[in-house]
Amino acid sequence: MDKKEIFDALDDFSQNLLTTLAEVDAIKKHLQGVIDENTTLRLENSKLRERLEKEDKTGHKSSNFGKENLENIYEDGFHICTFSYGQRRDNDEPCMFCVELLNRD
C-alpha cells in the first residue's frame, strides 16, 4: 500500500465515522422524544388512576354526575369540547369551547 491509498482509506474511514455519528445523533433525538412522550403518558395515566380510585371510594353518584365528570376531566388538563376532546391542554390554558360547555345550564 502506498501513501495515497492509506490516505484515501483513512479519508473514507473518517467519512464513515461522520455518517455514523450523524445517525447516532438522530437516534438519540428520537429516543429523547420517545422518553418525553413516555413521561407525559405516565403522568396522565397516574392522574387518571388517582381520579378513578377517588371515584371508586366515594361510591355515590349525584344527579349532575355527567357535568361533574366533565369538570374533573377539564381540571385534570384535558379538553372536553367537541373539537379537541381528550387531548391535553397546553400548559393547562383555558379553552373557550370547553368553558362554554361547562357554563351551560
UniProtKB/Swiss-Prot annotation:
Record-linked InterPro entries: YabA (IPR010377)
Q: Where in the cell is it found?
A: Cytoplasm, Nucleoid
Q: Name one GO cellular component term.
A: nucleoid
Query: Which residues does the record give as Zn(2+) binding sites?
Result: 79, 81, 95, 98
Q: Which keywords does this Swiss-Prot/TrEMBL entry list?
A: Cytoplasm, DNA replication, DNA replication inhibitor, Metal-binding, Zinc
Annotated GO biological process: DNA replication
Q: Name one Pfam family in it.
A: YabA
Q: Does the keyword Zinc apply?
A: yes
Q: How is the cofactor bound?
A: Binds 1 zinc ion per subunit.
Does the keyword Metal-binding feature in the UniProt annotation?
Answer: yes
- Main role? Involved in control of chromosome replication initiation. Inhibits the cooperative binding of DnaA to the oriC region, thus negatively regulating initiation of chromosome replication. Inhibits the ability of DnaA-ATP to form a helix on DNA; does not disassemble preformed DnaA-DNA helices. Decreases the residence time of DnaA on the chromosome at its binding sites (oriC, replication forks and promoter-binding sites). Tethers DnaA to the replication machinery via the DNA polymerase beta sliding clamp subunit (dnaN).
Q: How does it assemble?
A: Homotetramer. Interacts with both DnaA and DnaN, acting as a bridge between these two proteins.
Protein family: Belongs to the YabA family.
Q: Which NCBIfam families match?
A: PRK13169.1-1 (NF009640)
List the protein's name. Replication initiation control protein YabA
The source organism is Streptococcus suis (strain 05ZYH33)
* This protein's encoding gene: yabA
